[in-house]
Amino acid sequence: MLNNINTFAKTNLCHVFSASLIPSLQTNVMQRYEAFHFNGKIITDSFRLSQQLHHLGYCKKRYYYIQHYEWMNTQVLPYTIIKNTLLHPSVELIVQSQDQVELIEQLSNKKVKYVMNNWDLNILSQIADE
């Protein structure tokens, strides 16, 4: 993942929002709360953080990158959480593999926007060019 993001950042403007510094990243690393003022396209692969995507008022596009089904680890999953992540109209869905497409589309009643394996450079470029 880090290698792909570093390669992508060489030719595209790229920011990473993180709770801590990531020394091996060769791009802008900012604290997570800075995402609330970010006016570009934002992708998160964290289910917890995806719940905040609809609150990011300045974002041009919001993507939830589903690599794993994190929500299955919760004991109780209120509908409002699903509504604010998988079902929210301003959040586009990206999945890790083609095997996930049917399940996620049935669960969310939305089309999966991209299939992106491990932060694939070609898909990141397509998203940047949208």
Task: Kindly give the residue locations of the regions a language model identified.
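Membrane-proximal helix-turn-helix segments that form the acceptor-binding/catalytic region
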Residues: 30-37, 76-93
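Active-site proximal beta-strand in glycosyltransferases
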Residues: 41-43, 56-73
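A short, active-site helix/loop in glycosyltransferases that binds the activated sugar's phosphate group
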Residues: 52-53, 90-114
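Short, polar loop motifs at secondary-structure junctions
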Residues: 17-22, 45-51, 96-102
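N-terminal pre-catalytic "stem/leader" segment of glycosyltransferase-like enzymes
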Residues: 1-38, 107, 124-130
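Short N-terminal targeting/anchoring amphipathic segment
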Residues: 32-50
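Short hydrophobic/aromatic-enriched beta-strand-loop microsegments
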Residues: 61-67, 111-118
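Short beta-strand->alpha-helix junction loop in the catalytic core
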Residues: 69-71, 115-126
